[in-house]
């Protein structure tokens, strides 16, 4: 089926379902939308009934102009499951999506089968000033993307990608990596349905109140944590901290990859996800 809309906790949420089998819900990260799963969506739909959606304040979902919290995002995810009559699902989150999934797992363990966390945080590692700088950079990024999407994307890629992959994208922007995506595709995705300055502020508010470290030991679900060796945004050490606190968790480090490891190392990441979710 194509994209659909549902009224979730008073907010119109856009979602898409594809594939058959056990349900798998994908939760995207900050400033992104459901299209961020370009390297995962189709490969995973060959094995699962995959649901991807735009968080409130992102993509084609409604963008109520008030500060968001991680619990609000988790409640939306739970309510979407109820709307779709899904009692239990695997749930996967990348970056901010991984933070939402951790919050969701603490509050709604009965709704989860297995958990996959990719390049995420159990708490904001800096102070309020650091968060303010991050917010200002993201708002500047919004204007840069509107002005020159290509330049803005490759500039941002310095932080997100391992240097050799970024270099290859710049040299050959039309190359289809793993038959799944090109740099041109990623530039297009990064510049459509942009999170506006007020959306950025509302999403960042969720980070400012976020710390689940003390609650992670309550998560009993089997959990796979995929960290990236060269991640400069959600460092490997933070994913190791999550692993140390979730009792039934397994940590795999993707080598020679940055925060964008689901793209840089798509076949490897997808294989880890599929094997973990399919295993008894």
Model-based region annotation:
Residues 4-66:
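Conserved HGGG/HGGXW glycine-rich cap/lid loop of the alpha/beta-hydrolase fold
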Residues 42, 51-96, 271:
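Active-site loop/oxyanion-hole signature of alpha/beta-hydrolase fold enzymes
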Residues 98-109, 115:
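Short glycine-enriched nucleophile-adjacent loop
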Residues 113-147:
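Flexible "cap/lid" loop of the alpha/beta hydrolase fold
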Residues 128, 150-205, 214-215:
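Conserved alpha/beta-hydrolase catalytic His-Asp/Glu region
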Residues 219, 225-227:
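Short beta-strand/loop motif that positions the catalytic acidic residue
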Residues 230-234:
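Acidic catalytic loop of the alpha/beta-hydrolase fold
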Residues 249-280:
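Catalytic active-site module of serine/aspartate enzymes centered on a nucleophile-bearing elbow/loop
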